């Protein structure tokens, strides 16, 4: 029997409000997870509205069965980085009224030791979002060069002791390969020089490996760039990020498309022509969870919501 793991959607009300739901609109939940945001969107859609969900986790696809009887809902098994292609396959480019992304690992993924995401629960060192394909964390750690590991830990985990930890992993794996999350977490805790308060020494390395194994930042970049091309005029984009790497990407993306393309000085272009290169405008300021939400769900603490709107020129 499959064990169920609870998931509380972060910034639920604020994220869906950011979409400015039209009852007859077409919306995309780019990170279905366990369906919390999708459920709220469906509550606000009318009988002719439509919601398309995307997720690459087979367990999320199974969870979507809860909406099997709702004709307004459909789900695609795949990565959100291919969002624009899925929209084109459906013939809906330029007709999407809103897209939401909730980046990061869901509570069910973290809480299920068999998925291998958590350094607090012993399980196979997997970390794949889609555990039906691709290289596992254990397989990568077994073959990666010290320089490659150090680069991943530094770039994706912002780990200050990246090279030292990479050397220690390489030395230990020559004796016994790392196959379990606890083995890796214990090694990092033993050799790490980190003194961050209230943060496990393995936090940054586990984050880095997960991001690398799943090509998360590349997927996010593709998803955001694809989203802006498929939105209808006045279509909304609600994006939740969970760590500084993600949030910087989202912030820069919105800023870049809000400013438009830089035009060489002296070109005979009108202001209206220059404005046509501006594709988005930011809606309000970044939103963080309330103290009450953090009390209910400690994992919401680091989340940030940013909302943007597709311009119509």
Curated annotation (Swiss-Prot):
<dbReference type="GO" id="GO:0070475">
    <property type="term" value="P:rRNA base methylation"/>
</dbReference>
<keyword id="KW-0808">Transferase</keyword>
<protein>
    <recommendedName>
        <fullName>Ribosomal RNA small subunit methyltransferase H</fullName>
        <ecNumber>2.1.1.199</ecNumber>
    </recommendedName>
</protein>
<dbReference type="Pfam" id="PF01795">
    <property type="entry name" value="Methyltransf_5"/>
</dbReference>
<keyword id="KW-0949">S-adenosyl-L-methionine</keyword>
<dbReference type="GO" id="GO:0071424">
    <property type="term" value="F:rRNA (cytosine-N4-)-methyltransferase activity"/>
</dbReference>
<keyword id="KW-0489">Methyltransferase</keyword>
<keyword id="KW-0963">Cytoplasm</keyword>
<keyword id="KW-0698">rRNA processing</keyword>
<feature type="binding site">
    <location>
        <position position="80"/>
    </location>
    <ligand>
        <name>S-adenosyl-L-methionine</name>
    </ligand>
</feature>
<feature type="binding site">
    <location>
        <begin position="35"/>
        <end position="37"/>
    </location>
    <ligand>
        <name>S-adenosyl-L-methionine</name>
    </ligand>
</feature>
<dbReference type="InterPro" id="IPR023397">
    <property type="entry name" value="SAM-dep_MeTrfase_MraW_recog"/>
</dbReference>
<dbReference type="InterPro" id="IPR002903">
    <property type="entry name" value="RsmH"/>
</dbReference>
<feature type="binding site">
    <location>
        <position position="55"/>
    </location>
    <ligand>
        <name>S-adenosyl-L-methionine</name>
    </ligand>
</feature>
<dbReference type="InterPro" id="IPR029063">
    <property type="entry name" value="SAM-dependent_MTases_sf"/>
</dbReference>
<comment type="similarity">
    <text>Belongs to the methyltransferase superfamily. RsmH family.</text>
</comment>
<feature type="binding site">
    <location>
        <position position="102"/>
    </location>
    <ligand>
        <name>S-adenosyl-L-methionine</name>
    </ligand>
</feature>
<dbReference type="GO" id="GO:0005737">
    <property type="term" value="C:cytoplasm"/>
</dbReference>
<comment type="function">
    <text>Specifically methylates the N4 position of cytidine in position 1402 (C1402) of 16S rRNA.</text>
</comment>
<feature type="binding site">
    <location>
        <position position="109"/>
    </location>
    <ligand>
        <name>S-adenosyl-L-methionine</name>
    </ligand>
</feature>
